[in-house]
């Protein structure tokens, strides 16, 4: 365009922008010179394409098909113990129609029945453990129309309470979340520390590797009740075999207890007396035996266990036995006494 007659005329008239344009080209002009040239020659600016935010539209699939195959645990011997690899079901997450998350937690210690329902039996024979591989798999069982989200996070402090809001949950490093109808995996970094297998007495901070935090929120009222399953996939080293151990947890109502962590007790002051609740920390079938030094207001009764049967009399110097089937962690039985810390003993056994 530098040969345009108009450019030659402006150059002959001494216009600096025209002279420079003829000799060196349009690209060498300054912004002000280009503006002057356009005005002099009546050149209109070309429209500039404006950036537009890219939106990717996703459609939920009509159906998702997948298959999971359970395998036998792999066990190998080591110099001072064994190495075991396996996969176990922790829980089934349920919908939560609230916008704030509802939490379910799982303590990471081989003696924890609510997390490791198979590993607990073998771990009871060893003094120490070390996880060398640890990950958690969420497997959906809800349709693709299910709303809200599911999140998994790991906290190294097993005694710390869950986050108090959604922002705190997502502030946890490594937190993974997705819609309920999509599966995902949370991989937890392990360390080289040997920890003690919990005995039900020690401070959890000294024996537990941490805890898994599971959260659900935002589901609709008409969504499926069950969202999906959470499984743990692990490789653990068990060290320093201790020999024979008890499969039963024993204790009294003063809080002294020993053995694997099968149950936890809580108490509240009611109108009829002190209400004692026994919560089972894992699922399965349990035997619970109580010895009363003093007659209670009421003996063993079902609170929310899936199945319950009781034998024996709730009287002074008597023993009551209950068979309890637990389908969900935290289900349990109850009794009422006149004393906050009644004299007596109890034994819990997984059968």
UniProtKB/Swiss-Prot annotation:
Annotated region (S domain, virion shell), positions in chain: 82-238
Gene Ontology cellular component annotations, sorted alphabetically: T=3 icosahedral viral capsid
Presence of keyword Cytoplasm: no
Keywords tagged on the record: Calcium, Capsid protein, Host-virus interaction, Inhibition of host innate immune response by virus, RNA-binding, Suppressor of RNA silencing, T=3 icosahedral capsid protein, Viral immunoevasion, Virion
Pfam family, one: Viral_coat
Coiled-coil blocks: none
Name recorded for this polypeptide: Capsid protein
Source organism of the structure: Turnip crinkle virus
